[in-house]
Every structure is written in structure tokens, then in C-alpha cells.
């Protein structure tokens, strides 16, 4: 299918219509010109919010996740233009606890607060939703540690 599209593009690139509608042959372009003429669009389906959440919860729930994968996942998640759902943060905090990485738990909570930006109601909501997990895992928030005053 791609080959047929490339051939059509190559033929279209080598001919042009004159002022009276007659087709004229032009110089034959190189293969790069034919390839550049093809537009490749993704026909894949868009990921729903539920699928996005499930993908990240599954990622952080991997039993063999290591510290590098944890940090990579957190860094990737932080680059998105949104605040992660509490269930994703819960899975990330549990992964931190499995790895005994307390510093990453604080960084995650700080990143969530930063991602909330001027919307002051988001961070307290996330903490409220995560409170049972924070208590279960013995994780203190940056505010409880006094890091918000530094």
C-alpha cells in the first residue's frame, strides 16, 4: 500500500499541467522527493482517560520495577500537561515504598503540588484521596515535614 502511494507521488511529482491542460514531463526527482510527498497520519485510536490511568497504574505496580524505571516513569508522568489521578499517584507511592525510596515519595507529592499550579483546590483534594495510603505507608507530606516553608 505504501509502495503504491509512493509510485503515485512519484508520477505526480514528475508531471505537471501546462497552461492548456496538457501534461508535461518534468525532471525525475530523486527518491527522497517522492517520500517527502507522502503524508503519514496516525490512524491509531486515541487513548481514553481510563486507559491512560490503567497503563500508568500497571506500570508502577510492576513487581520487578527498579529505581531507574520508577524515576523514569515519574519524570515522564510529570511532563504531561495534567495532574495525575490519585490512583496513579497511589501506585507510584507504593512502588517507592517497595523500593524504600522515601525521597521519591516527597518529590512526587511536590510535583503534584507544582502541577496543580494556581488551582489551590487540586492539591488538598489529592492529599485527601491519598491520606489512607500515606498513613498506611508511613509517608509524610512535604507540609508535614516543613518543606513548604523553606
Curated annotation (Swiss-Prot):
Entries under Gene3D superfamilies matching the protein: Cytochrome c oxidase, subunit Va/VI
**Keywords of the record:** Acetylation, Heme, Iron, Membrane, Metal-binding, Mitochondrion, Mitochondrion inner membrane, Phosphoprotein, Transit peptide, Ubl conjugation
PTM notes: In response to mitochondrial stress, the precursor protein is ubiquitinated by the SIFI complex in the cytoplasm before mitochondrial import, leading to its degradation. Within the SIFI complex, UBR4 initiates ubiquitin chain that are further elongated or branched by KCMF1.
> Modified residue N6-acetyllysine is at which positions?
87, 113
Q: Which gene encodes it?
A: COX5A
Q: How does it assemble?
A: Component of the cytochrome c oxidase (complex IV, CIV), a multisubunit enzyme composed of 14 subunits. The complex is composed of a catalytic core of 3 subunits MT-CO1, MT-CO2 and MT-CO3, encoded in the mitochondrial DNA, and 11 supernumerary subunits COX4I, COX5A, COX5B, COX6A, COX6B, COX6C, COX7A, COX7B, COX7C, COX8 and NDUFA4, which are encoded in the nuclear genome.
Pfam families referenced in this protein's UniProt entry, alphabetically: COX5A (PF02284)
**What are the GO BP annotations of this UniProt entry?**
mitochondrial electron transport, cytochrome c to oxygen
Q: Name one GO cellular component term.
A: respiratory chain complex IV
Origin organism of this chain? Symphalangus syndactylus (Siamang)
Residue numbers of Phosphothreonine PTMs: 141
Concerning SUPFAM superfamilies, the annotation shows: Cytochrome c oxidase subunit E (SSF48479)
Write out the similarity annotation: Belongs to the cytochrome c oxidase subunit 5A family.
Q: What does this protein do?
A: Component of the cytochrome c oxidase, the last enzyme in the mitochondrial electron transport chain which drives oxidative phosphorylation. The respiratory chain contains 3 multisubunit complexes succinate dehydrogenase (complex II, CII), ubiquinol-cytochrome c oxidoreductase (cytochrome b-c1 complex, complex III, CIII) and cytochrome c oxidase (complex IV, CIV), that cooperate to transfer electrons derived from NADH and succinate to molecular oxygen, creating an electrochemical gradient over the inner membrane that drives transmembrane transport and the ATP synthase.
Q: Name one GO molecular function term.
A: metal ion binding
Q: In which pathway does it act?
A: Energy metabolism; oxidative phosphorylation
According to Swiss-Prot or TrEMBL, what is its membrane topology?
Peripheral membrane protein
Top-rank taxon of the source lineage equals Eukaryota
Q: Where in the cell is it found?
A: Mitochondrion inner membrane
Return the InterPro entries for the record: Cyt_c_oxidase_su5A/6, Cyt_c_oxidase_su5A/6_sf
Q: What is this protein called?
A: Cytochrome c oxidase subunit 5A, mitochondrial
Question: Which residue interval is the transit peptide?
Answer: 1-41
Q: Where is this motif: SIFI-degron?
A: 2-17
